[in-house]
């Protein structure tokens, strides 16, 4: 339980004062409730479990004050969410963006013209557009801390919501209602980015080390590992001083599957590399390396299993810091890369022992691990780490990889000993 308690603490502590944090499912809700209700952590934050928002009783509860947090700013009356509107059709009647307040007003209206007929003949509320305009109150966004003063110029005038499906559920209707009424006075956070996926809002996030802040700054998602912009001045102190990881670094502590899964889902170790990379972009290379070291110290690979997303960015950042002149950064990168490559090779060797039907079953895993090994191999090539390239070359040769497919670092054998090469076809 210690790990989950810390996880709840980290989510709450990553948020700005007076925030609303939207959770998804049990694993990232109960730890926050535990911290807040039992230990009095961050009573100013309103925790809202989106999995419950389909229930009218929960919407009613969310409208009320809890601890030191005012209610969630919903405006729709009970008649619009009690035993009705479990699903709301989206019918694209306008080819332009409609203001979000007008959309909610349309749903609130009892005018028959604001209804649509379903296939069974019943009339129901609907959303008349897929594209919704959410105007940005820039002064409020600065005053509430949603946007730092230094980032004022990066704010957009309007955030555009793009509904991706032909209907939304009650949870999404209530989130739209909240967006129409929060007026940028209270920071909104998500524990999981996917809460905003169906609204097309993934490009308006900021990763604050644990939770994601909804911001009026456009940051297009380039890859799934790096969703959201980063404000290093906000996130670095949290990672260094505020967040807690319990005694996970103690080898006597068993990090079971659920701990591994939850730390992976919350990007706990990846966060250090992501913020370090932002520091590198600001020419703060020494600080970046300190952060990388701390991430591996608090959440060591010996405890928290390697994944490509919690390892590869560390390697990139160490080698980049080395190129920027930080003394031992490349050596640290080498040590981590060797440990990771050794683990990948152990996986590959283990799965290569299977043949027949079992061999077929594990071949996708072999392909995945070979891909990951290839990624770090080419990173080593890019960073000019000849010794490591030679070590991985030797392994590739044992798999029967042809010389022309290997990067030559002056390690070609004069005569290949053919006894090494015959291998099962699974290595293809």
Q: Which residues does each predicted region cover?
A:
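ER/secretory pathway lumenal C-terminal domains and tails of membrane proteins involved
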Residues: 2-18, 30-428
């Amino acid at each position: 339980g210690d790990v989950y308690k810390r996880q709840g603490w980290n989510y709450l502590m990553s948020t700005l004062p007076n925030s609303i944090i939207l959770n998804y499912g049990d694993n990232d809700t109960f730890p926050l409730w535990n911290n807040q209700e039992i230990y009095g952590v961050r009573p100013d934050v309103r925790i809202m479990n989106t999995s419950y928002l389909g229930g009218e009783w929960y919407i009613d509860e969310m409208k009320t004050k809890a601890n030191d947090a005012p209610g969630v700013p919903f405006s729709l009356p009970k008649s619009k969410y009690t035993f009705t509107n479990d699903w709301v059709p989206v019918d694209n009647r306008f080819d332009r963006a409609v203001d979000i307040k007008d959309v909610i007003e349309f749903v609130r209206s009892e005018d028959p013209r604001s209804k649509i007929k379903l296939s069974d003949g019943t009339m129901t509320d609907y959303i008349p557009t897929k594209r919704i305009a959410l105007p940005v109150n820039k002064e409020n966004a600065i005053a509430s801390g949603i946007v730092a003063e230094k980032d004022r110029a990066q704010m957009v005038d309007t955030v555009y919501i793009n509904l991706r499906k032909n209907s939304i559920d009650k949870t999404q209707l209530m989130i739209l209602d909240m967006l129409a009424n929060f007026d940028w006075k209270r920071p909104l956070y998500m524990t999981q980015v996917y809460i905003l996926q169906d609204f097309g809002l993934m490009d308006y996030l900021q990763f604050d080390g644990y939770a994601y802040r909804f911001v009026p700054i456009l940051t297009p998602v380039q890859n799934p590992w790096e969703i959201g912009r980063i404000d290093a001045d906000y996130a670095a102190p949290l990672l260094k001083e505020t967040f807690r990881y319990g005694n996970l670094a103690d080898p006597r502590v068993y990090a079971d599957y659920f701990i591994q899964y939850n730390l992976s889902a919350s990007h706990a170790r990846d966060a250090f590399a992501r913020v370090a990379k932002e520091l590198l972009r600001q020419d703060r290379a020494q600080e970046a390396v300190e952060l990388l070291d701390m991430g591996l110290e608090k959440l060591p690979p010996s405890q928290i299993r390697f994944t490509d997303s919690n390892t590869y960015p560390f390697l990139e950042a160490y080698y980049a810091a080395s190129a920027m002149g930080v003394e031992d950064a490349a050596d640290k990168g080498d040590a981590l890369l060797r440990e990771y490559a050794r683990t990948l090779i152990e996986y590959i060797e283990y799965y290569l022992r299977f043949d027949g039907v079992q061999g077929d079953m594990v071949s996708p895993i072999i392909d995945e691990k070979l891909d990951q090994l290839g990624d770090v191999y080419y990173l080593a090539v890019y960073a000019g780490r000849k010794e490591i390239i030679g070590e991985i070359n030797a392994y590739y040769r044992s798999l029967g990889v042809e010389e022309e497919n290997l990067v030559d670092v002056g390690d070609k054998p004069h005569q290949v000993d053919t006894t090494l090469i015959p291998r099962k076809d699974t290595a293809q």
